[in-house]
């Protein structure tokens, strides 16, 4: 099984636990796992040309594509892109989706759309697998979709997260001014932030944890560090103080590191 990178630890771990050999960016694998609407942590989207290339490659080489369409609902800066499943005509692609981001996180209702070749293999075994989602929740969700509420809910949340991401970007820029680099994609609920930092990522994370802040580090060098900031679960009013706290933590860590170097 090939993943685009090593960031999706939960997914690669599941396959590894079931005896699959996990690799990264290897097109010669039998299974290719991709998230076209979430190619990077900051919301880059796989273009149609690349999707068609992947679909044609999988068809020609007999490989199976697993399309995890995570956050495909939150595309702000371009028109929605056709899914790999749709472009492939339902062949050689398994489509995975979830409603947890659109509805309550506690409603863990996900779904999988199989190509016809796999449906025939799955049908005789379907009764051997227990459904973990509540029947009541499934029925309520079905009615919710049937009545058209999911469409309006998606539009509402798309506007909400687009505005929140813009507000977060403005808060970061206000606090760090020109001393930072911000990346946002066409979709998603996160941005990447690169700031000057001479202390190692582990020390920065520990300092942040002591202040009640959890950091996700994408990359670090001897002179700077790149973080992922999410706007999904934090109120807009907390963006500015959170950014200021992050800057204080970073400045204090770097100052302490510089002082230690001088003393040594």
Q: Which residue stretches match the model-derived regions?
A:
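Conserved PLP-anchoring active-site segment centered on the Schiff-base-forming lysine
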Residues: 1-10
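Active-site phosphate-binding strand-loop segment of PLP-dependent enzymes
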Residues: 9, 15-76
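Conserved PLP-binding active-site segment of the aspartate aminotransferase-like
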Residues: 114, 192-197, 214-249
């Amino acid at each position: 099984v090939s993943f685009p990178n090593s960031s999706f630890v939960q997914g690669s771990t599941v396959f590894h636990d079931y005896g699959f050999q996990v690799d990264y960016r290897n097109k010669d694998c039998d299974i290719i796992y991709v998230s076209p609407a979430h190619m990077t942590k900051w919301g880059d989207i796989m273009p149609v040309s690349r999707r068609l290339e992947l679909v044609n490659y999988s068809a020609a080489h007999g490989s199976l594509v697993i399309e995890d369409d995570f956050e495909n609902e939150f595309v702000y800066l371009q028109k929605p892109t056709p899914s790999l499943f749709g472009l492939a005509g339902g062949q050689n692609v398994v489509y995975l989706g979830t409603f947890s981001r659109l509805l309550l996180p506690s409603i863990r209702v996900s779904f999988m759309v199989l190509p016809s070749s796999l449906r025939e293999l799955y049908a005789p075994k379907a009764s051997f697998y227990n459904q973990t989602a509540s029947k009541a929740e499934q029925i309520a969700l079905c009615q919710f979709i049937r009545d058209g509420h999911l469409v309006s809910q998606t539009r509402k949340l798309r506007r909400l997260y687009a505005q929140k991401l813009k507000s977060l970007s403005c808060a970061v820029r206000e606090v760090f001014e020109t001393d930072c680099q911000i990346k946002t994609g066409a979709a998603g609920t996160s941005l990447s932030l690169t700031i000057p930092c001479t202390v190692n990522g582990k020390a920065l994370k520990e300092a942040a944890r002591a202040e009640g802040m959890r950091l996700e580090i994408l990359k670090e060098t001897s002179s700077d560090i790149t973080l992922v900031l999410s706007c999904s679960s934090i109120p807009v009013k907390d963006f500015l103080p959170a950014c200021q706290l992050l800057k204080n933590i970073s400045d204090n860590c770097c100052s302490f590191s510089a002082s230690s170097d001088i003393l040594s």
